[in-house]
């Protein structure tokens, strides 16, 4: 017997991309904000189970620390939105998507990008969820 309110047969990955980047993961920064490499130290709006590392995926906002970049940016705690991940994820139409690297864009707590351009492609999931990122993206995949 089906569970009440189960609806159509959709997998978990059909709802949102796989969370493949745990706390501690290093990301390349794909904008011109001055940071080059960041490390995830927290995931915004992540409600996990006991003693489990918080993980993030494409389109999620994370709290990160700048590891490499301009001297005024280094060692700062910033917010970032993940725009690419190497781990393959499945879309509703059945297409599987993966990128060459794990990348993020530095944003304000409201979600406005701090840079003015984004290098490389941006996942459609991130561009739809964060409209300001989608507006400055050159390629949306």
UniProtKB/Swiss-Prot annotation:
Family designation: Belongs to the universal ribosomal protein uL14 family.
InterPro entries, A to Z: Ribosomal_uL14, Ribosomal_uL14_arc, Ribosomal_uL14_CS, Ribosomal_uL14_sf
Oligomeric and partner information: Part of the 50S ribosomal subunit. Forms a cluster with proteins L3 and L24e, part of which may contact the 16S rRNA in 2 intersubunit bridges.
Listed PANTHER family: 50S/60S RIBOSOMAL PROTEIN L14/L23, LARGE RIBOSOMAL SUBUNIT PROTEIN UL14
Function: Binds to 23S rRNA. Forms part of two intersubunit bridges in the 70S ribosome.
NCBIfam families: PRK08571.1, uL14_arch
A GO CC annotation given for this chain: cytosolic large ribosomal subunit
HAMAP family: Ribosomal_uL14
Gene that produces this protein: rpl14
Keyword list, A-Z: Ribonucleoprotein, Ribosomal protein, RNA-binding, rRNA-binding
Protein name: Large ribosomal subunit protein uL14
Signal peptide: none
Molecular function via GO: large ribosomal subunit rRNA binding; structural constituent of ribosome
GO BP: translation
Disulfide bonds: none
């Amino acid at each position: 017997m089906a569970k009440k309110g189960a609806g159509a047969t959709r997998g978990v990955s059909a709802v949102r991309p796989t969370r493949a980047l745990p706390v501690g993961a290093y990301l390349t920064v794909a904008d011109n904000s001055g940071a080059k490499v960041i490390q995830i130290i927290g995931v915004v709006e992540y409600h996990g189970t006991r003693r489990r590392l918080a993980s993030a995926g494409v389109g999620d906002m994370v709290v990160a620390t700048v590891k490499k970049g301009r001297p005024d940016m280094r060692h700062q705690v910033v917010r970032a939105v993940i725009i690419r991940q190497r781990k393959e994820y499945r879309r509703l139409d059945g297409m599987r998507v993966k990128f060459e690297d794990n990348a993020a864009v530095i944003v304000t707590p409201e979600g406005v990008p701090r840079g003015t351009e984004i290098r490389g492609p941006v996942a459609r999931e991130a561009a739809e969820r964060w409209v300001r990122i989608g507006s400055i993206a050159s390629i949306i995949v």
